[in-house]
């Protein structure tokens, strides 16, 4: 029988996103993993469609993720991304780089996540770029909305 502490460590996490402004990201912990919740701007959402040819798995066909995240934004609500913040290469934590065209990532960078350990890049839907060490998209954890401003991570039924 698992201890109360062990049960709590695996329990779903309820998050209030009422103060999460467009363009912002917050971090929460679920099952000992960092989970990012990103409120994407209209421009960021529009840019996602421009990246398909640069991505390894733009339609998330090769990924294990909830069925409701198998769309262009990989989200229940298009503007809100919920993703596990662990690189699918060797488990480092990528940095949030929403800026467009920074010198170190190139003029064609439209915002996303960059893993400083080995250079893997992911777009703002957590989809991995071609030609980087990471073999697959960032994980989308099970989650559901309890209201417009409350998300439950770790449970989707």
Locations of regions flagged by a protein language model:
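General structural signal for secondary-structure boundaries
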Residues: 11, 22, 41-42, 144-147
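Rieske [2Fe-2S] iron-sulfur-binding domain
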Residues: 53-155
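Short beta-strand or tight-loop elements
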Residues: 11-13, 33, 139
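Extracytoplasmic/periplasmic/luminal assembly and interaction segments
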Residues: 19-72
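A structural detector for beta-sheet-dominated domains
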Residues: 16-18, 29, 146, 154
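Solvent-exposed coil/turn segments that connect beta secondary-structure elements
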Residues: 31-33, 40-42, 118, 148, ...
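C-terminal segment of N-terminal export signals and the immediately downstream linker at the start
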Residues: 1-27
